[in-house]
């Protein structure tokens, strides 16, 4: 079981490393143009770290698709991670 944890974390680590590379080498060449706060790349890192590589990547893709001139942008934080709560019905 101890060996599985690093393997499960590997996709998350690789995705974050890729995004950090984009932030360091590509984004400065493009200039600041993201209409959202946090930026799309920061949002992607936060989403992947909070929700995991699959759901976090899906949230990041949805965010990037919203980043266009017809969308007003603004503050758009990563959604909180939902927890399952068992509700008991009172009698």
Curated annotation (Swiss-Prot):
Pfam families cross-referenced by the UniProt entry: YidD
Protein task: Could be involved in insertion of integral membrane proteins into the membrane.
Domain of life: Bacteria
Cell compartments where the protein resides: Cell inner membrane
Coiled-coil portions: none
Compositional bias annotation for Basic and acidic residues: 78-91
Signal sequence coordinates: none
InterPro entries xref list: Membr_insert_effic_factor_YidD
Listed name of the protein: Putative membrane protein insertion efficiency factor
Family classification: Belongs to the UPF0161 family.
Gene Ontology CC terms: plasma membrane
Keyword Membrane appears in the UniProt entry: yes
Membrane topology designation: Peripheral membrane protein
UniProt keywords, alphabetically: Cell inner membrane, Cell membrane, Membrane
Region annotation (Disordered) ranges: 72-91
Main location: membrane
Organism this protein belongs to: Pseudoalteromonas translucida (strain TAC 125)
């Amino acid at each position: 079981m101890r060996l599985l944890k690093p393997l499960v974390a590997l996709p998350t680590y690789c995705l974050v490393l890729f995004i950090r590379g984009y932030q360091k080498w590509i984004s400065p060449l493009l200039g600041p143009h993201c209409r959202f706060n946090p930026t799309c790349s920061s949002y992607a890192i936060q989403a992947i770290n909070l929700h995991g590589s699959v759901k976090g990547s899906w949230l990041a893709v949805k965010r990037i698709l919203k980043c266009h001139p017809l969308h007003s942008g603004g503050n758009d934080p990563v959604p909180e991670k939902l927890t399952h709560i068992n509700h008991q019905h009172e009698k």
